[in-house]
Amino acid sequence: MEAPGIVWVEESVSAITLYAVWLPPRTRDCLHALLYLVCRDAAGEARARFAEVSVGSSDLQDFYGSPDVSAPGAVAAARAATAPAASPLEPLGDPTLWRALYACVLAALERQTGRWALFVPLRLGWDPQTGLVVRVERASWGPPAAPRAALLDVEAKVDVDPLALSARVAEHPGARLAWARLAAIRDSPQCASSASLAVTITTRTARFAREYTTLAFPPTRKEGAFADLVEVCEVGLRPRGHPQRVTARVLLPRGYDYFVSAGDGFSAPALVALFRQWHTTVHAAPGALAPVFAFLGPGFEVRGGPVQYFAVLGFPGWPTFTVPAAAAAESARDLVRGAAATHAACLGAWPAVGARVVLPPRAWPAVASEAAGRLLPAFREAVARWHPTATTIQLLDPPAAVGPVWTARFCFSGLQAQLLAALAGLGEAGLPEARGRAGLERLDALVAAAPSEPWARAVLERLVPDACDACPALRQLLGGVMAAVCLQIEQTASSVKFAVCGGTGAAFWGLFNVDPGDADAAHGAIQDARRALEASVRAVLSANGIRPRLAPSLAPEGVYTHVVTWSQTGAWFWNSRDDTDFLQGFPLRGAAYAAAAEVMRDALRRILRRPAAGPPEEAVCAARGVMEDACDRFVLDAFGRRLDAEYWSVLTPPGEADDPLPQTAFRGGALLDAEQYWRRVVRVCPGGGESVGVPVDLYPRPLVLPPVDCAHHLREILREIQLVFTGVLEGVWGEGGSFVYPFDEKIRFLFP
């Protein structure tokens, strides 16, 4: 029975963002949030809708992960973010607070009005007295609405004092310069007002372009009208708990649902400056409640993050997706489709809020405890014994070399994510009421989509470790169950002529007791092993009440005749029949490392192809000759690239190579915006002292640098090669001595 006074409309929703946050009168432990819903009807016409939710301080603390946050504190931050002229980058102060607030408000929306979905037909029930959507249901009309893109190209010259950047980095060692730039702009917001800016936005029906020598003055170049791009819409509302009726003034996108920007040249300060200009222009006239102006992304974290994104939490009200500028056209389209699908599947909250898209951090311990209590004793014991430093399957202690013998690599693709979803379902009773059901259903949907959708796999690859980081008990549970699964794999393997020799998590490899010359028998044994291992894992999970939405599927990832291992993670697999190979555990940190890997793989082929006849001493001597020749070739080829800083540059994450940056690096302007996590460093010799690391991406092209310290880079790469070759000598011949390439004595003179 439908509630009286509610008007129902059938529309789809393309984005949900924060508009305003406040404390009701005489209340300190509960906040109210007004959400802006960008909708369109069956004819494609855009509509502005709003919904209101209430959030208690305890809910906010659950999503924050600690009691160090309150409703008044969140309201103060949101209120400050409505004035971008004075505070254009409020989330920089506490990005975790904004993640918690956004995730908490979305969860409250589903809890208080019904289950939402983006780009699918919905029945929205709104109250004419308040102007607010109060109920939502799935509609039956038509297929999902296809998301529509608008291409965004924006460049801005935001002059930031290099000394201010240097000061921010000095205060936070290891800080990424994208964050340092935003922090400096936050501290001096006037520099955003004086920025020069050029923007072009192309939709299916319009082209909008503006150029400003400074945002403090009108544009010097204009193409298209702002009204062709957006509609400025005012809606009168009477929110609950608000002392008076308010007017919301929003932008409605015309003919598109999101912006797409080229990621390689993407600049968060440029986009913030553009949106700040729009916010100032649209809300220059009085009479409307100013909306929240807040964003998240790796540039808002001191040490950044490996995934590039720009999350719009408030104004202008729809998302911006970034794709690599160098991506081929078809690849770029796939990336954009994946970004839109991720946005729809997670209500626009991924990756900004992380695992909070499923459950708040403080909800996972109860789920983990409930799930663990439902396991059989053997699994409970495995969970209790498991430790993060526990070794994985490792029958062959490195260094080792085997072959010719049939070996194969297998993987239960996506098993960890499937187990997380199944364990969460098993422990759902540990949640208070039904507060986590929508998030758990969302996790199930991601797991179901993962086999066919790369975007879903990408979400799960980051969601699982993020959830485990938020809850050590969940990490313990998932690690213990994975260990029990690995034990089941080992026990089953012996019955199918298979010995598991190594692996990590759901991926493992092993040897088959089959005639090395009988390829047909090997194929049959591999298929028998796959079926038996798959069935045994399914059975043991089912016996413990762990029922993944999709039955775990085991896939062979390669068949080989030789294996060389040199460390717990380093291994080279080779099939001498078709010359296919697979290398793991060798660092590919740059072009020079990749060249070294190719030379090394070629040398391993030459060594293993040599006949075993003759005294072992001669074989060892010949192998050492091949190894030294390989190193010679690599070093001589590298000599030809001695002036190429791009070739020698090495990719480093935060904390690995945090040498003091040269002061010239802080003068790179917008180039610094791209340093959001990784830093490519090359060692150069400025003269008069030791070599120093220079971040090559912070300087304009063509690079003008002191001579590259090739010897430094070569020693590091040769150290990795020597580790592999030493493993071959010990694994094949039991040779006790290590392989050491005489770089300094033999060829160092080439690199002064």
From Swiss-Prot:
Pfam families, per this entry?
Herpes_HEPA (PF03324)
Signal sequence interval, chain numbering: none
Cell location: Host nucleus
One GO cellular component this record assigns the protein to is: host cell nucleus
**Superkingdom of the source species:** Viruses
Q: Which UniProt keywords apply?
A: DNA replication, Host nucleus
Q: What is its main location?
A: host cell
* GO BP: any one term: DNA replication
Is Manganese one of the keywords?
no
**Assembly mode:** Associates with the primase and the helicase to form the helicase-primase complex. Interacts with the origin-binding protein. Interacts with the polymerase catalytic subunit.
Membership in a protein family: Belongs to the herpesviridae HEPA family.
Report the function annotation for this chain: Component of the helicase/primase complex. Unwinds the DNA at the replication forks and generates single-stranded DNA for both leading and lagging strand synthesis. The primase synthesizes short RNA primers on the lagging strand that the polymerase presumably elongates using dNTPs. The primase-associated factor has no known catalytic activity in the complex and may serve to facilitate the formation of the replisome by directly interacting with the origin-binding protein and the polymerase.
Query: HAMAP family this protein is in?
Result: HSV_HEPA
Q: What is this protein called?
A: DNA helicase/primase complex-associated protein
Q: Which species is the source of this protein?
A: Human herpesvirus 2 (strain HG52)
